[in-house]
Amino acid sequence: MKQLYDETLTYKRRLDLAIVLYTHQLHPSIQPVMKYVDVVSLWIWTGADIQKIEDNFKKYRSLVPDKQTLLGIYMWDFGGKKELNQDFMVKQLDFAYRLYKEGQIEGMIFHCTPLVNKNLQAVEYAKEWIAKHGDEKR
């Protein structure tokens, strides 16, 4: 990672070095790598872990206090291999919205899947949420 980071420093127009991180990977062992990262895309793999979203974000910030962060928003529970409960989607988006408005994250990434036309509750809620808040500024 250091070699890649150092290489980006030689570019005429330096590109940010971004990494995908899942909440189940939040461990002190990630810290040495994080010093070479500019942007973190933070994701929750298992829908049930959305219940711990606030604690996991605090843990993330204790390990990675100063990196630009995009919060990943899944519309399907990939870890649980099932439809994401709409209540979980509401909780996930409410928390992400608050973090964004407070300046704790730079934005959100909605994982676009082949499920977006399947009339799933979480997907429909996400569509409504994006229509309502998508153009908002801090």
Language-model regions: role of each:
Residues 43-48:
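Short, acidic/turn-prone active-site loops that include or flank metal/cofactor-
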Residues 1-28, 39-42, 66-79, 108-113:
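Aromatic-lined carbohydrate-recognition surfaces of secreted/lumenal glycan-active proteins
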Residues 3-11, 32, 36, 59-63, ...:
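Alpha-helical structural signal in soluble globular domains
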Residues 35-37, 52, 121:
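Alpha-helical protein-protein interaction elements
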Residues 49, 70-138:
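Substrate-binding cleft of secreted/luminal carbohydrate-active enzymes
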